From Swiss-Prot:
Physiological role: May play a role in male fertility. May act as a retinoid carrier protein within the epididymis.
Disulfide pattern: C85-C176
Name of the protein in question: Epididymal-specific lipocalin-10
Chain positions found as N6-acetyllysine: K165
InterPro entries given in the database record: Calycin, Lipocalin, Lipocalin_CS, Lipocln_cytosolic_FA-bd_dom
Organism: Mus musculus (Mouse)
PROSITE patterns on file: LIPOCALIN
Gene: Lcn10
Amino acid sequence: MKLEMALSIALALAVVSWTQEFFPKEAQTLNWSKFSGFWYIIAIATDTQGFLPARDKRKLGASVVKVHKTGQLRVVIAFSRPRGCQSREVTLKKDRKRPVFRNTLKGVKGFHVLSTDYTYGLVYLRLGRGGSNYKSLLLFNRQNISSFLSLREFLDTCHILQLTKQATILPKDDSCAHTILP
């Protein structure tokens, strides 16, 4: 029993340590002007129950990211939900110490670009209010199709975040995504 507990603690510490090394500590090098614009959401992994509709009703998501003011982003996200296509807009403020944007009043605990080459983006989104916390990993792409390498990175990151079972590649139907075209 004690050995199992010790092994569990050691494994948890190793995962936390490796996760901190995997994720960039600073996004200062990210060019937000280049990252800004329209993105298709090609894939999602989330621990939010009931977020996506039934498989036959799923569609590509979309996001528009804009630099609002210095240290602020305006983000619009559209998704096919159980009640149809829905979009939300929120203004996020950059954290002073961490490379993450947030708006806790609107339930956004973190919007963090984990990696990008400006044709794709891997975005870690943390939501929550009260005692509820949810994490999502989004694969952004400028086109409605993804490269093998960005999809592989998405799936590897899902594994690290323990979201592999929830990973979903969205079908190419972009009718919901086009509702927020700038």
